[in-house]
UniProtKB/Swiss-Prot annotation:
GO terms for biological process: translation. PANTHER family: 50S RIBOSOMAL PROTEIN L21 (PTHR21349), LARGE RIBOSOMAL SUBUNIT PROTEIN BL21M (PTHR21349:SF0). GO terms for molecular function: rRNA binding; structural constituent of ribosome. Transmembrane segments: none annotated. Belongs to the bacterial ribosomal protein bL21 family. It comes from Caldicellulosiruptor saccharolyticus (strain ATCC 43494 / DSM 8903 / Tp8T 6331). This is Large ribosomal subunit protein bL21. GO terms for cellular component: cytoplasm; ribonucleoprotein complex; ribosome. Pfam families: Ribosomal_L21p. Keywords: Ribonucleoprotein, Ribosomal protein, RNA-binding, rRNA-binding.
């Protein structure tokens, strides 16, 4: 059984036991979050596609940690003027483990 969920503006194909890095969620570590934006769900009964979401379907996940991702370097310059700027950015993310997929 797998599901396609939407969180943080991105879509993920998940199964029970999967560990994902998603955009930062407002939840404490070791808490359980309920994701109800399920776009599609596949099981032994068949494949169900939502319009846009499947009614009554949800995915439960356990929050494992909050951390920052690798640093991304942004370098901007303008030719012939000597102007340049170097910036770094580290995006926050949440690591979750899928515990339950319900229809």
């Amino acid at each position: 059984m797998y599901a396609i969920i939407e969180t943080g503006g991105k879509q993920y194909k998940v199964q029970e036991g999967d560990v994902l890095k998603v955009e930062k969620l407002k939840a404490d570590v070791d808490s359980v979050v309920k994701i109800d934006k399920v776009l599609a769900i596949s099981s032994d009964d068949g494949f169900v596609v939502g319009k846009p979401y499947v009614d009554g379907a949800y995915v439960e996940a356990k929050v494992l940690e909050h951390a920052k991702d690798k640093k991304i370097i942004v370098f901007t310059y303008k030719s012939k003027t000597g102007y340049h700027r170097k910036l770094g950015h580290r995006q926050w993310y949440t690591k979750i483990q899928i515990t339950k997929i319900a229809k």
